Each structure stands twice: as C-alpha cells, then as structure tokens.
Amino acid sequence: MKIKEGYMPFHEYKTYYRIVGEPSADKAPLLIHGGPGSSHNYFELMDDYAETGRQLIMYDQVGCGKSSLPEDPGVYVKETWAEELVALRKFLHLDELHMLGQSWGGMLEMYYLTSFDPQGIKSVMIDGSPASIKLWVQEQHRLIKYLSYEDRAAIAEAERTGDFTNVKYLAANDRYMEKYCWDDPDENSPEPLRRPTNGKRASLIAEGPNEFTENGTISDFDVTDQLHKIHVPVLVTSGTDDLCTPLIAKSVVDHIPGAKWHLFANSRHLALLDQHDEFIHVLDQWLAAND
C-alpha cells in the first residue's frame, strides 16, 4: 500500500502529513486527531481501510507528533490550529473532501465550519466531541462520582490544592481514563499506540492538567449557539462509556440541522479501538452515502 509522508511549511514551523492509498473518485477523509496534544498515531489503525480504494489523509497538528513543537505558548490556541487546517487544505489541494475529527479534532471541525464557512466539504464526522467545554467539565465531574471513594477524594484534593503531582491523584486519574477513555498502551498494544505523541506542552497550555480541570486556552470554548450555521451532512458518534457522554453528544446533534448520531455500545472515548470493525463500517457507510 502506498504511503506518502511530508511536511507543509507553516509560518516558521512545519506540519507533518501522511497520505495512505491512491487517489480515486471517492473523496478522501481528512482525519483530525484529538488532544490538544495527541497525534495522528492512532489513525494508523485505519490504514487497511485505504485498501478499499479510498485514500486517507492524516496529519500532526503543530505542537504534536512529528510536527514542530514550538516553545511559544501563544501558538497553542484554536485559531492557530484552524489556520493550519486552512493551510493544509490549500497545500494538499483538498478542494473536495470528507472530514473526521476525533475529540478535540471534532471541536476544531466545529470551530472551522462555523467561523470560516469553508467550501467543498462533502461530509463531516464528529467523533466524541463537545461543543461546550463548560458542559464537558460538568459531565466529567458527574462521571467521577462513579469512581471509588478513595479516587474521588484524591481528585477533589488535587482540584482544591492545584497539586496534580500527588501519587494518589495520578493513580486515580489513570483509573478514570482507563474507565472512560482508553487503556494506557503497553508492550502488547499496536505499535502506533506505543509511539510518543510529543504533545505534552500543547496539552497543558491548551487544555490543562486533565479532562476535568480545563483551565487552558480552550477552557472557554463554546460554539453551541453557532452550530446552526453548519449546512453540510454531519454524523456525530460517541460511546456509551465515553468521556463524551450521551448528553454531550446530543447537545451537538440537537444544534446542527439534519445531523445524525451513532452511539457505539460498550465503547469508551475511542470507538476506533474499542469497536474497531463497527467504527470502520459506520465510517464506510457514511462516506459512501455522501460522496
């Protein structure tokens, strides 16, 4: 299978991109990773899908993965990543495309669609993404209530003191993420998941120390009242055991005209991992219906 890798100049930085498969009449989906501070790595688990004849395009947002890792904290704002998305479409001549954004990637999609009125978007898949960080934080604190008393106490103490280095807090947060997000990669995990994402700085500056203490540059993110501007086909996806709770997903669906929703049973924040075959099937059916 053909894989093309390269870099796009972006200001004084560079953005890594990866294209899997050959061009065809079927429009390629642009895969937008989460975080902020993750990388394209987990999307490599979709490489086999390109063998169906549909090319896949993925990239590392600046501050992540194989892209430049600026020390300037002013880089790590939604405006930078939206500008980068605009530039990448132009650089790769993506005049017509589908888009799939996972977690923060879906938030970036929503911001891009409501602020830039882009043309040539065949369809959009928003996977596990909130339109409002305020609602996200509220729901994370509700999910915390399902943890043990000891873990709840450790998290509450960390939030009260601002000390997110205590070993009890770190262990509690690990269990929280394993319950609602994904399993921490180990030696048995697929190779792409074991690779570093290099996005710690981006994550701390843009998001904060964890999923429920959002005090970074995107802490005021809320495009809920702008979602009515989206007039392309949209599929929202989420899991039953997801950081992106059904309430969060529904708040997106309810505000986008004509949006559809697929809820993955027994799935946490990455249905691509927890329900891989179903995820690929849902994606394939969605893209085919909107080519």
Curated annotation (Swiss-Prot):
> Which Gene3D superfamilies does this UniProt record tie to the protein?
alpha/beta hydrolase
Instruction: Please tell me whether the keyword Amino-acid biosynthesis is annotated for this protein.
Output: no
For this protein, the Enzyme Commission number is 3.4.11.5
Provide a Gene Ontology MF annotation, just one: aminopeptidase activity
Q: Where are the transmembrane segments?
A: none
Its name, as the record gives it, is Proline iminopeptidase
Q: Superkingdom, according to UniProt?
A: Bacteria
List the source organism.
Answer: Lacticaseibacillus rhamnosus (strain Lc 705)
Catalytic activity of the protein: Release of N-terminal proline from a peptide
Indicate the principal place this protein occupies in or around the cell: other
Q: What is the lineage of its organism?
A: Bacteria, Bacillati, Bacillota, Bacilli, Lactobacillales
Protein family according to the UniProt entry: Belongs to the peptidase S33 family.
Record's InterPro entries?
AB_hydrolase_1, AB_hydrolase_fold, AB_hydrolase_sf, Peptidase_S33, Pro_imino_pep
Ranges for domain AB hydrolase-1? 30-274
Q: Which UniProt keywords apply?
A: Aminopeptidase, Hydrolase, Protease
Question: What is the purpose of this protein?
Answer: Releases the N-terminal proline from various substrates.
Locations listed in the record:
Cell envelope
List the record's Gene Ontology CC terms alphabetically.
cell envelope; membrane
Instruction: Indicate the residues that form the catalytic site.
Output: S103, D242, H269
